[in-house]
């Protein structure tokens, strides 16, 4: 299946580390929404959305991209890294994919080093994440889909 993963990974590049590991072992197109993003996704069978978590949600830029360019009825999946414990991080992106009648086929998440907002005052949280094991788990998640 032809697959693209649209992503936003800033600050420490935690999410991009997972995607690079996936792309090293599988044929997948990585689309960075901050750099010349591809806008025609119709040729892809599956579309992943990957992001760090910002204020308990996927990046606004990624959500806006999905609203504008995600075709109707595609298979979608989510990959994300977060500093804080798991929460309702997928609500906003799921609203977009559900409105476009997409079929969700999976999600993978793990902690990522986070110095955003108040965590900076503490020297960050989740240092050393994603780990090699978490990265391997992301690759295994992708392979199983």
Predicted segment positions?
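FMN-binding flavodoxin-like domain, especially the glycine-rich phosphate-binding loop
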Residues: 3-4, 10, 16, 23-31, ...
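Catalytic beta/alpha-barrel core
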Residues: 34
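Short amphipathic alpha-helix with an adjacent loop that forms part of the alpha/beta core around
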Residues: 37-43
């Amino acid at each position: 299946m032809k697959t693209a993963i649209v992503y936003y990974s800033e600050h420490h590049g935690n999410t991009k580390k997972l995607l690079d590991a996936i792309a090293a072992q599988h044929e997948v197109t990585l689309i960075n929404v901050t750099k010349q993003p591809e806008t025609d996704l119709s040729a892809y069978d599956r579309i992943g959305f990957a992001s760090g978590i910002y204020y308990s949600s996927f990046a606004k830029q990624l959500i806006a991209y999905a609203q504008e360019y995600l075709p109707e009825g595609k298979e979608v999946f989510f990959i994300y890294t977060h500093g804080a414990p798991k929460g309702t991080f997928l609500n906003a992106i799921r609203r977009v994919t559900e409105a476009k009648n997409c079929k969700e086929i999976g999600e993978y998440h793990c902690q990522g080093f986070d110095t955003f907002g108040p965590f900076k005052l503490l020297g960050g949280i989740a240092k050393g994440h994603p780990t090699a094991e978490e990265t391997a788990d992301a690759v295994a998640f992708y392979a199983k889909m």
